[in-house]
Curated annotation (Swiss-Prot):
Its EC number is 2.5.1.145. Catalyzes the transfer of the diacylglyceryl group from phosphatidylglycerol to the sulfhydryl group of the N-terminal cysteine of a prolipoprotein, the first step in the formation of mature lipoproteins. This is Phosphatidylglycerol--prolipoprotein diacylglyceryl transferase. The chain crosses the membrane at residues 14-34, 57-77, 90-110, 117-137, 174-194, 200-220, 240-260. It comes from Francisella tularensis subsp. tularensis (strain SCHU S4 / Schu 4).
Length: 268
């Protein structure tokens, strides 16, 4: 059995002000995304934005992630609770963010920013997709430090006892998601972007691979108590929300490969 490290969720306290690791992980993900996107804007001739526009894009995306992630969590996962405790909606430092809500927020941010600068929405998504897994991985580390979103009870050597998860060891599902949705997904997408490839291949890969990774990792994660298993006595809310991403990613990839066969696909 692995030992849970018991990290204090508060990274720094200045008088009454508490700075939580959870928030710092989001800031780290946003900063890393800004840095790599700016780098790509300098070296990629097909980049839909200029390096000096990356800061504004990052601001739009950060708002989309925070607002969309929080609103998505409230709507998808715990609406009755927040309906009766509306003030809790603003306690972001206690956790409670939805990737799928954040993804919708980012799509809205992309649409608004693309319209502002006159860029193509899908080109913008293709350009930014390789750096998104960094933020996903950072968020999962924040979940792990918070001791939340732990996995199912297990007798596996990978199990650990979480402070709020009862006396039995559980899968550290946050670390599984950090590895597959963060490390593996980033590595695959970044390697694909090194050489020329068909347009929108990376966008399709991101949506398809993330959806698959999340769907699989959900089998190790404890279902949300307010929902449990929703369909077939094994499907969770996270899996249901991942299916549209898998399907849309598959559609994009199929369209790309059809264009390749017809020699109508533009490489970038």
């Amino acid at each position: 059995m692995l030992q849970y490290p018991h990290i204090n969720p508060v990274a720094l306290q200045l008088g009454p002000i508490k700075i939580h690791w959870y928030g710092l992980m989001y800031l780290l993900g946003i900063f890393a995304g800004w840095y790599l996107t700016r780098y790509r804007a300098k070296v990629k001739p097909w980049a839909p934005i200029k390096p000096e526009q990356v800061g504004d894009l990052t601001f739009y995306v950060a708002l989309g992630v925070i607002l969309g992630g929080r609103i998505g969590y409230i709507i998808f996962y715990n609406l009755p609770y927040y309906f009766h405790n509306p003030s809790q909606m603003f306690f972001l430092w206690d956790g409670g963010m939805s990737f799928h809500g954040g993804f919708i927020g980012v799509l809205i941010a992309f649409a608004l920013f693309a319209r502002k600068i006159g860029a193509n929405f899908f080109d913008l998504g293709e350009f930014v997709a390789p750096v998104i897994p960094i933020g996903l991985g950072a968020g999962r580390i924040g979940n792990f430090i918070n001791g939340e979103l732990w996995g199912k009870v297990t007798d596996s050597p990978l199990g650990m006892v979480f402070p709020t998860g009862g006396p039995l060891p559980r899968y550290p599902s946050q670390l599984f998601e950090f590895f597959f949705e963060g490390v593996v997904l980033f590595s695959v997408l970044w390697l694909v972007t090194i050489k020329k490839r068909p347009r929108y291949l990376v966008l399709g890969l991101f949506m398809f691979l993330y959806g698959c990774a999340r769907f699989i990792c959900e089998f190790f994660r404890q279902p949300d108590p307010q929902y449990g298993y929703i369909f077939f006595n094994w499907m969770t809310m996270g899996q249901i929300l991942s299916i549209p991403m898998i399907l849309l990613g598959a559609v994009i990839l199929i369209a790309v490969f059809i264009k390749i066969r017809k020699n109508k696909c533009k490489n970038i």
